[in-house]
Amino acid sequence: MFSRVFAVASLAALALAGPLSVRDQCNTGTIQCCQQVQQASYYQSAFQEIGLGELLAGVTGQIGTQCSPISVVGASNGAQCNAQTVCCTNTQFNGLINIGCMPINVNA
């Protein structure tokens, strides 16, 4: 008898809990709006051609260029990013180059 009550109560609790809401987070810095996002390997060959290949040595992931910070609060109230919204781990030259970028969706 108690096993049935326990089983029904467990299923009811799972049904009421529902799915968890997943939100985009940027724990490593500010959310950026970048005009262009490319794999680091795309830029490594160009940097090597001009003799600056060692600057991106060891950099993996994506690199954003011409980025400007946006806030999640602003994004939900109508601020728009007409390019790629990303979360980057390292911002250089006031957003001209952002390293370690990961695309995110701020509309979720």
Swiss-Prot record:
Q: Which GO terms describe its cellular component?
A: extracellular region; fungal-type cell wall
Domain of life from the UniProt record: Eukaryota
Localization? Secreted; Secreted, Cell wall
**Pfam families from the entry?**
Hydrophobin
Induction info reads: Expression is not regulated by ammonium and glucose concentrations. Expression is down-regulated during preinfection stage (12h) of ectomycorrhizal interaction with Castanea sativa roots.
In this UniProt entry, which cysteines form S-S bonds?
Answer: C26-C87, C33-C81, C34-C67, C88-C101
Q: Which UniProt keywords apply?
A: Cell wall, Disulfide bond, Secreted, Signal
Which InterPro entries did the record assign? Hydrophobin (IPR001338), Hydrophobin_CS (IPR019778)
Keyword match Phosphoprotein: no
Q: Which residues form the signal peptide?
A: 1-17
Q: Where are the transmembrane segments?
A: none
Q: Which PROSITE patterns match?
A: HYDROPHOBIN
Cite a single GO MF annotation. Answer: structural constituent of cell wall
Quaternary structure (record):
Self-assembles to form functional amyloid fibrils called rodlets. Self-assembly into fibrillar rodlets occurs spontaneously at hydrophobic:hydrophilic interfaces and the rodlets further associate laterally to form amphipathic monolayers.
Family from the record = Belongs to the fungal hydrophobin family.
Main function: Aerial growth, conidiation, and dispersal of filamentous fungi in the environment rely upon a capability of their secreting small amphipathic proteins called hydrophobins (HPBs) with low sequence identity. Class I can self-assemble into an outermost layer of rodlet bundles on aerial cell surfaces, conferring cellular hydrophobicity that supports fungal growth, development and dispersal; whereas Class II form highly ordered films at water-air interfaces through intermolecular interactions but contribute nothing to the rodlet structure.
Q: What is this protein called?
A: Class I hydrophobin 3
- Native organism is Pisolithus tinctorius (Dead man's foot)
Gene name of the encoded protein:
hydPt-3
